[in-house]
Swiss-Prot record:
Domain of life: Bacteria
PANTHER family the record matches: GLUTATHIONE SYNTHETASE (PTHR21621:SF4), RIBOSOMAL PROTEIN S6 MODIFICATION PROTEIN (PTHR21621)
InterPro entries tied to this protein: ATP-grasp, ATP_grasp_subdomain_1, Glut_synth_pro, GSHS_ATP-bd, GSHS_N, PreATP-grasp_dom_sf
Pathway as given in its UniProt record: Sulfur metabolism; glutathione biosynthesis; glutathione from L-cysteine and L-glutamate: step 2/2
Cofactor remark from the record: Binds 1 Mg(2+) or Mn(2+) ion per subunit.
Protein name: Glutathione synthetase
Main enzyme class: ligase
Organism: Agrobacterium fabrum (strain C58 / ATCC 33970)
Family in the record: Belongs to the prokaryotic GSH synthase family.
EC number(s) on file: 6.3.2.3
Ranges for domain ATP-grasp: 127-311
GO terms, molecular function: ATP binding; glutathione synthase activity; metal ion binding
GO cellular component: cytoplasm
The UniProt record lists the keyword Aminoacyl-tRNA synthetase: no
Length: 319
């Protein structure tokens, strides 16, 4: 049995989070309640020297009090292999800085259990991983070829155009067949993004909400429905979407059954998927949100279920 004592959280700085809706805070608060020592560091404090992985960390104490939610000790440099668990929880963009951190953390995983598995996080970008389940998705095009995008829009009518590696609803546009700004939109994307873009058929069901379903070790444990603002195509809570309680439909349960084995095979202990109507649009493996909202609406204590799964995983390890 590999008992957990020390837990490091690689995250955006704790001073900047909104504790009312932050899943990293919920995960960390549950770890603290279980008696683990918490260590906080931001991605830029991660380093490798002579083959060993270090970070400049602060021991962290949390309080569920707005405006007074954390205390940090003096910084110290530690060998991250001395940690039992590390949570990879900084927000995207999924850029080379993010990818580099997965390469470094891969050096100490799984002896130090990194959640989620850093190699598979690197190899499973949210908007690309989901295409492995093409029959569960809306019609989708990934390209930077503007003629292909124009052809796709002519076939689909209304489309959604978004950056391939964005997050939080940033850069998401709804373009109708007769949109006179379409050429300008493609020009803007060409100036802003070096990578291909993703275009998807517009799903009118988004007006009823975009469902975020949370899975722990491949099993659904909670969900919220995110309803977009009246004049916005985006339902992300970062973009003004309104969360509301919900239950899983038979179709959504089927989607979870289909993807569960792939999540477990890749070591994804905590995942959030997005579903509009009958279609899955993303599999979020970097820093899924929604834990506090699920709990607020009377759903499961997802943070507790996640730590149960982590403890089970550690117990199965034999070092």
């Amino acid at each position: 049995m590999a008992k957990i004592k020390n837990v490091a959280i690689q995250m955006d700085h704790v001073s900047g989070i909104n504790i009312a809706g932050d899943s990293t805070f919920a995960i960390s608060l549950e770890a603290q309640a279980r008696g683990y020592r918490l260590f906080h560091y931001t991605p830029e404090r991660l380093s490798m020297r002579d083959g060993k992985i270090y970070a400049t960390v602060e021991q962290m104490e949390l309080r569920d009090i707005k405006g007074d939610h954390f205390s940090l000790s003096e910084p110290e440099r530690v060998d991250l292999s001395t940690m039992d668990v590390i949570h990879l929880r900084q927000d995207p963009p999924f850029d080379m800085a993010y990818i580099t951190s997965t390469h470094l953390l891969e050096r100490i995983h799984p002896k130090t259990l990194v959640v989620n598995d850093p190699a598979w996080v690197r190899n499973s970008p949210e908007k690309i991983f989901v295409t492995e389940f093409a029959d569960l998705m809306p019609k989708t095009l990934i390209t930077k070829d503007v003629s292909e995008i124009a052809r796709f829009r002519n076939e689909m009518g209304d489309i959604i155009l978004k950056p391939l590696y964005g997050n939080g609803g940033a850069g998401v546009f709804h373009s109708a067949r007769d949109d006179r700004n379409f050429s300008s939109l493609l020009e803007m994307f060409g100036q802003m993004f070096r990578e291909p873009y993703i275009a998807q058929e517009y799903l009118p069901d988004v007006r009823k909400g975009d469902k975020r379903i949370l899975l722990v070790d491949g099993e659904p444990v909670g969900a919220i429905n995110r309803v977009p603002a009246e004049n916005d195509a985006r339902s992300n809570m970062h973009a003004g979407g309104r969360p509301e309680p919900t239950e899983l439909t038979a179709r959504e349960q089927e989607i979870c059954r289909r993807i569960g084995p792939a999540l477990r095979e890749r070591g994804f202990l905590f995942v959030g998927i997005d579903v509009i109507g009958d279609y899955m649009t993303e599999i979020n493996v970097t820093s899924p949100t929604g834990i506090r909202e699920v709990r607020k609406f009377g759903g499961a204590d997802v943070a507790s279920l996640l730590w149960d799964a982590i403890e089970k995983k550690r117990d199965a390890q034999d070092f």
